[in-house]
Every structure is written in structure tokens, then in C-alpha cells.
Amino acid sequence: MLFRSGTGRTDAGVHALGQVGSFRTQSHLSAQDFQRALNALLPPAIRIVGAEEVGPDFNARWSARGKTYRYRLYRGRVVPPMIWRYVLHYPFPLDEDAMRDAAARFVGTHDFAAFAASTGTEEDDKERSTEREIYSTELVRTGDNEELVFTVCGRSFLRYMVRKMVGTLLDVGRGKLAPADIDRLFELRDRSKSGPTVPPHGLVMVEVQHEEAWHL
């Protein structure tokens, strides 16, 4: 008998480097044997890069204490063919200092209703909690200065939240919004006032942080 648990779901088209899963089983196979067996069954784009036994109280989802996401914007004129699946091409002028100011305002505990996907009904939107805690944000140039990369670490995230955050930062960079408008969006709770939801392919879930004492 086997019971499964994953850290969480990513939006369709979003990549994951640090997805974590856990399961309970009555099998006597070692963790390494499970790793080899699973990799033999999975498609090449999905790999189990490590496996180990954990304590009975560990759950990949409920033991998670934070997640780190990264969104890559390619700023050059021509996207190299080896990376086009993993970046959003955005060669337009941007005020990156204003974007960094805006990104810093995400840090802390706020109501991210303006940055979340709709549940489909106004009643459901009002009932669900949209308060989230963001631990840190960073906006830096990488890749021979051709890429602008937004990294965010938080306790948990709403559906489409990171992609809406990036879209809003781009609106700040283009001068459509001011950095101080981030604070106003927390109060308004109106997703129509925030930036667009950027495409999923530039986003990757980099890491999931778990409690320290989960190893056997």
C-alpha cells in the first residue's frame, strides 16, 4: 500500500527544479532502489535526483516552510535557441530601479488578492484567505547582463500570484504604475488594477524549504 503527497502544484507550463514528494509504503525496497525504478518509468524531462527515508511525521506538503520561485526575463535582442523555453523575451525599456523599489514592497505579510487568480465566483473569492507572507525578493541582472531575474521566497503562494507579481513589476518598469502603487493594490484587493499575468514558461520553482528535523 502506498500513500502519496507532493509539495504542491505548479501552473501548467511552469518548470520545477526543487519539487519534493513523499510517500509511505510497506515495500522493503531501499530509497535508492525506488529512485532507480521511478526514473526508469518517468519521461526524460522528469528526474528523481535524490531519495532518502524520512521520519513518520514528515509530509512533503504540510512540512514545507517556504518556497522559492524565479522568473527569467531575457532583455537582449535575440533569445538564444537553447533557452527560449525558459525565459520571457522582453527587450523593451524598463526602469529597473523602480522595479526593485516595487519588489521590495512585496516583502512582509500582505493581502495578495490583487495578485491572485479568481476562483470563479465572487462569494468564493471573499471567503478564501488571500493573506500571504513573503520572506524576500530580489531583482538582478545575470547571464552576461542579458537577463533580468526576479526571485521571490515566501511561506506559500496563491495561484498565478508570482506571475501577476512579475506582470505588475513590468508595469512599474514601463511607467504604467509607480512603486507606491503596490501598497495601494494590497488595500484595493482588485486584480483588474494589477499587472497582467505573464506567461508561465519563464517561471521555475527553484526550491522548497522544509523543517530541519525531518531526517531519520
Indicate residue ranges for each PLM-predicted region:
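Structured-RNA-binding interfaces characteristic of tRNA pseudouridine synthases
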Residues: F3-L216
